[in-house]
Amino acid sequence: MRSGEELDGFEGEASSTSMISGASSPYQPTTEPVSQRRGLAGLRCDPDYLRGALGRLKVAQVILALIAFICIETIMACSPCEGLYFFEFVSCSAFVVTGVLLIMFSLNLHMRIPQINWNLTDLVNTGLSAFLFFIASIVLAALNHRAGAEIAAVIFGFLATAAYAVNTFLAVQKWRVSVRQQSTNDYIRARTESRDVDSRPEIQRLDTFSYSTNVTVRKKSPTNLLSLNHWQLA
C-alpha cells in the first residue's frame, strides 16, 4: 500500500513539475495573429492605380526626373556651377521622393499608415517639385553653354515641370473631394446619433434624471455644510 501511495505521490509531483516547467518555458505557442507575423508578405501591386491618371503621371515624373539627373551628371565642366548644382539637387530630390510615393501608392502601403494625410502629402510634393523644376530649368537655360547635355537637361526639366503641374491640379481636386467626403461622413454620423437619441426616450429620461440629481445634490450640499459647522461649534 505504501509503495502505491508513494508512486501516486511521485506521479503527482512529476505532473505538477511538468506543468510548472511548461508554464515557465520560453518556447510557448504565441497568440500573435498570423497577419501581424507576416510582415510585408501580404503586399500586392495595385494595377488600377498604375493604370489611372495619377499612377501614369507618377511613373512619368520618376522617369523624367531620372533622365534629367543623368543628363546633368554627364556635364564635366561648368562655370559658373550654381545653376547646375541647383538643378542636380532638384532632379535628385524629386526622383527620390516621387519614387517613394509611387511605391507607397502602388503597393497600398499608405493604407497601413492612416495617420498621415497622403492626399495632402502628394499635393505638397507635386506642387513643390513643379515650382522647383521650373525655377531650376529657367536658371540652367539662362546659364547654358550650348552643351548637348545642358540642353537635354533643360528640355527634360520643363517636361518634368509639366508632368508635376498636371499632377498638382489632379491632386488638388482629389484632396477637395476627400475633405468634402470627410465632412459629409461627420455630418451623417452626427445626424444618426441625434436620431438614435430621439428614437430612444429612455436615454432622454436618464439624462434628465441625472441632471436633476446633480442639481439636487448641489442645492443640498450648502445646507449640509452649515449643519455640520453648527454641530462642530456646539
UniProtKB/Swiss-Prot annotation:
Could you tell me which residues belong to the region Disordered? 1-38
* Purpose of the protein: Acts as a backup for CMTM6 to regulate plasma membrane expression of PD-L1/CD274, an immune inhibitory ligand critical for immune tolerance to self and antitumor immunity. May protect PD-L1/CD274 from being polyubiquitinated and targeted for degradation.
Topology of the protein relative to the lipid bilayer: Multi-pass membrane protein
Q: In which tissues is it expressed?
A: Highly expressed in testis and prostate.
| Ranges annotated as biased composition (Low complexity) | 15-25
Subcellular location(s): the record lists: Membrane
Q: Mark the residues carrying the PTM Phosphoserine.
A: 194
Q: Where are the transmembrane segments?
A: 59-79, 85-105, 123-143, 151-171
Provide the family line: Belongs to the chemokine-like factor family.
Record-annotated MARVEL domain positions: 49-176
| Name the record gives this protein | CKLF-like MARVEL transmembrane domain-containing protein 4
What gene name does this entry carry?
CMTM4
Q: Which UniProt keywords apply?
A: Membrane, Phosphoprotein, Transmembrane, Transmembrane helix
* GO CC annotation, single: membrane
Compositional bias, Acidic residues, is annotated for: 1-11
The organism's lineage?
Answer: Eukaryota, Metazoa, Chordata, Craniata, Vertebrata
What Pfam families does this protein map onto? MARVEL
Q: Provide the species name.
A: Homo sapiens (Human)
Subunit structure, per the record? Interacts with PD-L1/CD274 and CMTM6.
Main localization, broad class: membrane
